[in-house]
Design a protein with these regions (language model features):
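Sec-type signal peptide cleavage vicinity
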Residues: 2-6, 20-291
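Bacterial N-terminal signal peptides
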Residues: 8-17
């Protein structure tokens, strides 16, 4: 009987010890918050879930500002952006700052004064839509929840449109639009504010080539372009065909325009040509609209 009681007491003690250990593990697990993100992309004209993986540099706030994440890639897993290796938040009162760039395979570096930098970016046909995010002074979440991080484009979207202000019997068809002296390379850094340093390479952009018969309503000429933000005064060449409605068609009329352009980070510029029946543009050459 004593032996049986001894075994029972030993079992109870073992069970209590296991329960205590399990409770300790649960409490420790609850305290350990894995760094994860809820990532979205937002611009003045479009927003939605981020689609490309991104990489993050994460610093603890404080005197030392220890680097916790260093060019760590994050990808979506069941709607939450996680890294392949788990990284934990610090104590409950800890704060962090995150600096991110997308897509994750873009060559980038980080420094505390300039943030994330991408050098030698080339806005070629295959160039990605470069996005970035800066999130400072973020506290450790109270629950096992992802940290919201919002990306914006490092580029500027540009759209060209045209409308006719000619009389109804006049037909005007736009066939080509080009821009000269557009910088296509540059270096981008996110701190202290997002800024581009333009490279020496400049080129002529063919904005549109085709046939668009103008109406009194503005129509898009080609697709929206993503360009490196810059201030420039390009030569704009607008080519069109003119039908007077009296059996005479004049083809390939070229009109050159010089206008100051200002393309800013994360913005969209819309330019509208107003073409008249005077074989040229009206005095209101281009309407620039920023969104």
């Amino acid at each position: 009987m004593k032996k049986s009681l001894s075994i029972s007491l030993s079992f109870v003690a073992l069970l209590l010890a296991h329960s205590s250990c399990l409770q300790e593990r649960v409490e420790r697990f609850e305290q350990d918050r894995v760094i994860a993100f809820d990532a979205i992309f937002s611009n003045p004209t479009k927003s939605g879930a981020l689609k490309s993986p991104f990489k993050v540099w994460g610093l603890e706030s404080g005197q030392t500002a220890e680097m916790v994440l260093e060019a760590e890639s994050f990808s979506p897993v069941d709607g939450i952006w996680r890294s392949e290796r788990e990284h934990l938040w610090g104590p409950d009162d800890s704060m962090m700052s995150f600096f991110a760039i997308s897509p994750s395979d873009v060559p980038a570096t980080f420094s505390r004064d300039k943030g994330v930098c991408v050098n030698g970016f080339d806005i070629s046909a295959s160039a990605p839509d470069l996005k970035f995010a800066t999130l400072t002074g973020v506290r450790k979440p109270q629950a096992d929840l992802p940290t919201s991080i919002v990306f914006q484009s490092a580029l500027c979207d540009v759209e060209f449109r045209a409308k006719s202000v000619a009389s109804d019997d006049i037909s005007i068809t736009i066939t080509k639009v080009t821009l000269s002296d557009v910088a296509t390379t540059g270096d981008f850094c996110t701190l202290p504010s997002p800024e581009w340093t333009l490279g020496p390479k400049k080129t002529e952009f063919v904005v549109f080539e085709g046939n668009v018969l103008l109406t009194e309503d503005a129509q898009s000429l080609g697709e929206v372009m993503s360009v490196i933000p810059q201030n420039l005064k390009p030569r704009i060449t607008l080519r069109y065909n003119f039908d007077s409605g009296m059996g005479g068609v004049i083809k390939d009329i070229d009109v050159e325009i010089n206008r100051d352009f200002k393309w800013r980070v994360g913005k969209k510029r819309v330019y509208t040509f107003k073409v008249s029946q005077n074989l040229g543009l009206t005095s209101d050459i281009v309407i620039a609209e920023e969104k």
